């Protein structure tokens, strides 16, 4: 009995690598066309929004402020605390389902049109680099060639500093950022280190790592096999129309030959030369394709030149390429995802509408959780954080419901400005005999001057009995 014969798999390396494993540096040609124009408008619009949002004030707060040290998050005037776990969970789930839906419908449109990696690289860093390269080649002698890299990396550094500061503003607010920028780094070494590290990472990414962020690091490309289906929008090459490839196609097209030897693809390589990740779109759907449509603009320009119809490379679907049939809009994914998304948004709206203007949080004070004072009783410092989500200043009366617990508050009632969060320390004193197994539970009640009430249970730590 003959042993089975297995075909050896076709060897293939990443498009950013040479066959010997060394890196293949890409310098994609910029192909002008209708999609590049639209992408530029979208890209610069997103950059403008990204830079402007931290400076826009709604209710006295930044439009978006992810205050991680303060454990609060502001979204267009709405303040969420770390205790708003249900709201945060529903919001994150809604974002994920939206990504699933958009991917099922539009493929990797986010990667090619909205991802910061693509937007900054293709509309900020790379255009400057290519403009300086043209300037250096146009000059005589070696002066321009020597100066161009210095100018390039100087501009790259300036871009990275601006983007890094803008990025940090989302986490620290522009008020803190403005203070840090006008002071010596020695007065705030921690934030200065974070900013420097962020600038360094951006320089490394956009000056060196580049497309490898999309093809090697980013997990979204690897998710597309699960998120895409045969009807999802992709950038594809019409093999039935384009094959077999050959330069002879030009003569056949221009002469109007009926019985043709070649397809419409003249094998010019324009689609490969313009691809920012270095792939050949004619090889079919690939992990590295970001759906930017640069190959579409490049191929359309060639088709116009030789007098052939455009669309040899186009936004399409696997179903359309294989069968010629139109993509199906209504299918299991596109029906299930909107239904789930609608349910999540309704639940989110319900939870948000039931959120009161008062929210409190009890936090264990850093350091020793309790001390035994002279009379033998146990005193526990507890941090109380109050968020005033109303549009007016509120006074909050603080009380402990257990009668055997003595509370000392520095300020009571405690004032909090509108749309602000403030903290105070409560000193709670109780008998050591009330602790069972080293802890006991108390209830803290906070009532606002407008009548809103919130209560929280908290576990005090004490001596073991």
Residue spans for each PLM region:
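Intrinsically disordered, low-complexity Pro/Gly/Ser/Thr-rich segments with frequent PxxP/GP/PP motifs
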Residues: 408-433
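Terminal connector regions
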Residues: 431-465
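Short, hydrophobic/aromatic beta-strand segments
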Residues: 392-400, 456
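Hydrophobic alpha-helical transmembrane segments in integral membrane proteins
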Residues: 346-370
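Short solvent-exposed strand-capping/beta-turn motif centered on an Asx-Ser/Thr pair
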Residues: 387-392, 449
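Cysteine-centered iron-sulfur cluster-binding motifs in ferredoxin-type domains/subunits
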Residues: 103-118, 206-221, 257-303
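Membrane-embedded alpha-helical bundles of multi-pass integral membrane proteins
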Residues: 1-245, 296, 309-342
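Short, solvent-exposed loop/linker segments at beta-strand-coil boundaries, enriched for Pro/Gly
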Residues: 402-408
């Amino acid at each position: 009995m003959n042993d089975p014969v297995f075909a050896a798999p076709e060897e293939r390396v990443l498009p950013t690598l040479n066959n010997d494993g060394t890196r293949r540096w890409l310098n994609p040609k910029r192909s002008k066309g209708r999609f590049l124009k639209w992408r530029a408008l979208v890209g610069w619009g997103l950059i403008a929004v990204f830079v402007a949002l931290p400076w826009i004030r709604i209710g006295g707060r930044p439009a978006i402020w992810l205050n991680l040290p303060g454990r609060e998050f502001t979204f267009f005037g709405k303040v969420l605390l770390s205790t708003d776990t249900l709201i945060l969970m529903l919001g994150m789930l809604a974002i994920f389902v939206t990504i699933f839906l958009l991917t099922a419908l539009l493929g990797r449109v986010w990667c090619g049109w909205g991802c910061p990696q693509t937007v900054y690289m293709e509309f900020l860093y790379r255009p400057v680099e290519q403009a300086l390269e043209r300037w250096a080649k146009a000059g005589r002698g070696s002066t321009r060639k020597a100066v161009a890299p210095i100018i390039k990396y100087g501009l790259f550094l300036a871009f990275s500093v601006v983007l890094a500061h803008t990025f940090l503003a989302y986490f620290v607010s522009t008020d803190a950022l403005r203070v840090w920028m006008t002071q010596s780094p020695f007065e705030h070494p921690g934030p200065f280190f974070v900013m420097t590290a962020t600038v360094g990472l951006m320089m490394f990414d956009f000056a060196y790592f580049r497309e490898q962020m999309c093809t090697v690091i980013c997990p979204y490309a690897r998710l597309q096999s699960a998120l895409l289906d045969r009807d999802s929008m992709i950038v594809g090459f019409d093999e039935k129309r384009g094959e077999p490839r050959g330069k002879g196609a030009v003569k056949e097209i221009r002469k109007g030959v009926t019985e043709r030897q070649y397809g419409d693809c003249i094998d010019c390589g324009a689609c490969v030369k313009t691809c920012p990740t270095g792939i050949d779109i004619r090889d079919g759907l690939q992990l590295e394709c970001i759906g930017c449509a640069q190959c579409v603009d490049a191929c359309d320009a060639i088709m116009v030149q030789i007098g052939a119809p455009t669309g040899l490379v186009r936004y399409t679907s696997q179903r359309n390429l294989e069968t010629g049939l139109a993509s199906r809009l209504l299918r299991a994914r596109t029906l299930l995802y909107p239904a789930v998304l609608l349910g999540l948004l309704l639940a989110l709206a319900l939870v948000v509408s039931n959120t009161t203007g008062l929210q409190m949080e009890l936090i264990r004070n850093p350091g020793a959780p309790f001390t035994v004072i002279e009379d033998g009783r146990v005193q526990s410092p507890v941090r109380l954080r109050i968020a005033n989500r109303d549009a007016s200043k509120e006074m909050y009366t603080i009380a402990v419901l257990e009668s055997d617990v003595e509370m000392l508050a520095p300020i009571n009632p405690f004032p909090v400005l509108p749309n602000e969060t403030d903290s105070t320390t409560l000193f709670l004193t109780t008998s050591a005999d009330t602790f069972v197994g080293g802890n006991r539970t108390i209830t803290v009640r906070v009532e606002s001057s407008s009548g809103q009430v919130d209560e929280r249970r908290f576990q005090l730590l004490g001596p073991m009995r």
